[in-house]
Amino acid sequence: MEMQWRRLRERLASEQCQDDSVEIDKNECQFFYRLWRCLNDPHAGQADRLHGYYDALQCAHAHGLLPLRLPLKELISTPELARAGLCRNRDYPGEILLDEKALQIAPDLLSVWRNDKRRMLQAPPLDNLLPTLLHDVKYTHYTSVGQQLAVRTVLTSQKDRFLFINLPTGAGKTFIIHSLMLAASPGQLTLVIVPTISLAIEQAHRAQEVFQQAGVDHGGEYAWHSGQSAEERNALKERIKAGEQRLLFCSPEAASSGSLLLLLFSLAKRKLIEALVVDEAHLIDQWGAEFRPEFQLLAPLVKSLVEVAQASIRTVLLSATWSQSTLNTLKELFAGDCPQAIVEVNGSFLRPEPMWYVHKAKDKNDYQLQVEAAIQTLPRPLILYVTTVEDALSWHQYLRTSGYQRSGLIHGKTSPKQRAKQIADWADDNLDIMVATSAFGVGMDKNNVRSVLHVAVPENIDRLYQESGRGGRDGFASVAQIIYRPDQIALARRLNRDNLIGAKKGFLRWQKMHLNRESEGKGRFSVYLATKHDSIKIDSRANIAWNWRTLLLLQRAGFLSLHFSAPDLEQFASNQQSEDAVDRYFNHYFSHIQIELHRDGHLDKQVWNGTLRQLRSQELQTRQKGFLVLEEWLNHQDKPLCGMLETFYTLDGYVPELACGGCPGCREKALPPYSPTLGLIAHAISDEEHGRIGRDIRVYYPSARSSALLLRQWNDWIARLLVNRDIHAIRASQTVLAQLSQQLFKGVPFWCALSPEDATTRWDELVIVMPGERLPDLDPFSDIKRIIVAPETLLEQNVRGRLWWESDPRARSLDQFIRSLSSGHHK
């Protein structure tokens, strides 16, 4: 750090300040690096440059670097310097300092400029098979116990499972996707649906780097998006048809487009879809019924693909911020008719990076002054969140006129082209401030955001936490601040109540859709999603969205389930149809939804006024809960936010690991930031049944040969156990695990690598004891199946003179066991 500071001072004092060749190490100090970028950016404004000096000086202040001043040759007035928290040095007029007020800034804020590490995770070693697949020396450990459990659970689960994965930002959800693809059978496609096109492209680039290293990259595109040329799209289609694509990222809109959907149903018919993964899955609930109805198509799409395949498709839903209500909704949407297929993996912990600050303005003038002061002092990069498009435009205009030219703008009406440019500039550190509505930041892999400023009240605590969590993704301290006016509370309350269908209007919509239904056979009928009841005269997306909300309410109440019919693949078999013709077909296809009724009463007004009104009331209370928690915190800041978040994000009784970067309630109690080692606890929850206690199978072998030779001879039967899914884990010494990962043939299913001292897991396991080793201490009350293979002459522990297998009448020799594998009598 001292060398970087000295180098920065020397370059600023030299005549060649505008020099891109000068190395200021971004990884060592992002604040020095940003100042240098600003000074070499012809588009930067004066406020950008001055704040660059401010951040660099605060960083030096936090690290105790001397001299605490920087050369500034530009002639800038004293008032302008003062607005930036700076002043001229009386003894060295060509240099500037932090002014007295800036030096007296809250000490805990210095942790951001000091780059204090806040996130420390327990990182267990990778299972031995994964490094063999990855061929990358930098992958040696999981990021957390939660990631380890998630990868193991996903890769060993049955294909008919719906897996809900809850891992915090930075705990490695993306690695689950890469592992799933690498461990998949040849020819199988893993489809990953992400919220935005830009994220699909970004994730595809990251995946390609992994696959290049693993030696399985086909050299083409891994994302399906509208920006592709006809040549790129055709090549992608051919790889998908040939079973060579293996992994594909797309947005919900792309998954719902005719061209891709046709390919997906064709693959399903050939049983070539390995898994469907939804990243940021909480948005299905939060966005799907509002401005992105395509999210709500994903659940019926999965059901339809499974029907066409007449085989299971593993479905994985990933999120860092599940709330209980969202989790319950998605369980119902995806697995409402088969709850026994649900598997949850919860490796949640509270984010330790954000330091929370709240300021309630007295009036509009005070509000404006407080926001301006925050913009002038908060570390960069900074996201400034608003609620409305109008506010976004207003604050962006303020920044530009104030000299902050390195500021971007993204809201719900931003064009795709402009959005892509803004995101690229943001990712490349060409912007220091991003003004945004809630549509920005989802899944964005920008790790070094240091401040998130809310200048409006979000509609609930969940949104505040999600958006504030876009700071500090690199694990270092960040600032999360909210400045609000009293009148903004009412707007947040109204936003929180929007988009829930009422019983009266819902009944009218359903009555009209049902009246115009068309029979589809097999006990199903279809309804037109743009149906208008008598009070509606104009076609609109809003009308379709409200019809969706009506159908989803009926589904959540158990009256019906939603399905898409399989498209007529024969119609497109000749491959002569143009893409426009395909899209026209699917525009009509997606304007209808198939319905299967499960109970009576759906046309009874009394049922709507009773059962459905009660359900809607319960859902409204659930939705209001998030707002009420936020409102309570804003009104009672003496209550620790960390404790409130711990309660709010408790899922099915499992509490997230506690951490706190600093909140008003903890500061009032003089409590320092609480950043323990996290990622120590994870839970997998399912209805999967194991057999009775005591299912150990003891297998003994003669130990006359070397361990290496024995393992080579055993290769076939061990592989057979894995392929038949008789076991999902192997417990042995590291030497044995390493040799097995190298010698087992490619295509063998993933297996968990357990050392002898590891605790008992949820997976049936093979225990291998080589000559000269002792039996591990195994839990005798575990309900998993264990096949224990050990030398014939090994003595029972704590029982003098008795061989380890003699007390078990079911014990058998290895030769007998291998013969039983063919007959199936080994179980």
Where are these regions (language model features)?
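Generic beta-sheet signal
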Residues: 193, 301, 318, 455, ...
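C-terminal helicase lobe
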Residues: 374-393, 397-412, 418-438, 444-685, ...
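N-terminal helicase ATP-binding lobe
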Residues: 1-351, 363-380, 389, 393-406, ...
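Long, charge-rich boundary regions
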Residues: 641, 673-740
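C-terminal EAL-domain catalytic cores of bacterial cyclic di-GMP phosphodiesterases
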Residues: 786, 791, 800-802
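Short acidic low-complexity segments
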Residues: 436-438, 750-761
